[in-house]
A protein has these predicted regions:
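Primarily membrane-embedded glycan-assembly and transfer machineries that use lipid-linked glycans
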Residues: 1-133, 154-295
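Hydrophobic transmembrane alpha-helices
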Residues: 77, 136-150
């Protein structure tokens, strides 16, 4: 077994142990599983949206189906819930980076992994969604606006993939709505009242949602036209309704989309990408001159 695999496994186990041990008692600083605690409280309560304002501790903002999938975990203790939940972001990170880049990925996303948010799961859904479009339902039924990545299928006229993504989402909503219609009626209200609501919080990128969204749209369109899949997770990150610094973790999803499984491959991608970017910038004046001449 390569030594890098062992280091990756040890780091994953050590991180999991730290998250589980440090989550109890809840509220100490620096705490772990802060976001996961919101899911746990919503799971135990009768009203999942009793706390539903961005910036408020333990605010739950995702669709009812998210809690319905977590239903079996309501019967375990808080620490038991964390023990189960903490496996998911670590597994997602391992999927996106592979064993050789796991330590780098963990260093870049440790706060997000420890907090228990779903950005890395969003990243997995995006990567998997190129092959199995139904995976986009996870994006649409949690963070919602990163679903702007579906423009990839629109621009490329991959209508079958788009329909699979939308129909799968509709089917999930139909089943879930039958179980909790009241919660589904409230969820859109929760979303509209919280979009971009990160003003004044130190942990949020100070760029309003409506400023970020056009760049996300343009990036997906450009990426789709030039067959650059790595643009989709970056656009999804830009389109997050509330962009916390932890949301930058979605960028890790670019690793498998550019074929980077080792440090050497990642370095090569970065070097070649930089050269391409410089070349594009240098070509701008020439293109503008041609357009003026043609006009």
């Amino acid at each position: 077994v390569p030594i890098t695999y062992l280091f990756a496994l040890l780091a994953a186990v050590a991180t999991w142990v730290f998250i589980v041990l440090w989550c109890e008692p809840y509220g100490r600083w620096p705490g772990t599983a802060m976001d996961a605690h919101a899911y746990y409280l919503a799971l135990l309560g009768t009203d999942p949206y009793s706390i539903a304002h961005v910036g408020t501790p333990n605010a739950y903002l995702y669709s009812p189906i998210f809690l319905q999938l977590l239903w079996p975990l309501q019967f375990v203790s808080w620490q038991g819930f964390v023990a189960a939940w903490a496996i998911l972001p670590l597994a997602a990170l391992a999927y996106l980076t592979g064993p050789r880049l796991f330590l780098l990925g963990l260093a870049l996303t440790l706060a997000e992994v420890a907090g228990g948010n779903i950005e890395l799961l969003i990243g997995v859904a995006i990567v998997v969604g190129f092959r199995w479009p139904a995976a986009w339902s996870f994006v649409l039924l949690t963070k919602v606006t990163p679903g702007i990545g579906l423009l990839w299928f629109v621009v490329r006229r991959e209508w079958r993939s788009l329909m699979i993504a939308l129909l799968a989402t509709a089917a999930v909503v139909a089943v879930s709505f039958a179980l909790q219609p009241d919660a589904w009626i409230r969820w859109p209200q929760v979303l509209t009242s919280n979009t971009g609501a990160t003003k004044g919080t130190w942990a949020a990128v100070p760029i309003p949602f409506l400023y970020r969204l056009p760049f996300a749209v343009l990036l997906v369109i450009w990426g789709a036209r030039t067959s650059r899949r790595w643009t989709v997770p970056i656009a999804a990150m830009l389109a997050l309704p509330a962009l916390w610094y932890g949301g930058l973790a979605i960028i890790i999803a670019t690793f498998p989309l550019v074929g980077a499984k080792t440090w050497t491959e990642l370095r090569h991608v970065l070097v070649e990408g930089w050269k391409e970017l410089v070349g594009e910038v240098k070509a701008v004046p020439e293109r503008l001159a041609r357009r003026r001449t043609a006009a």
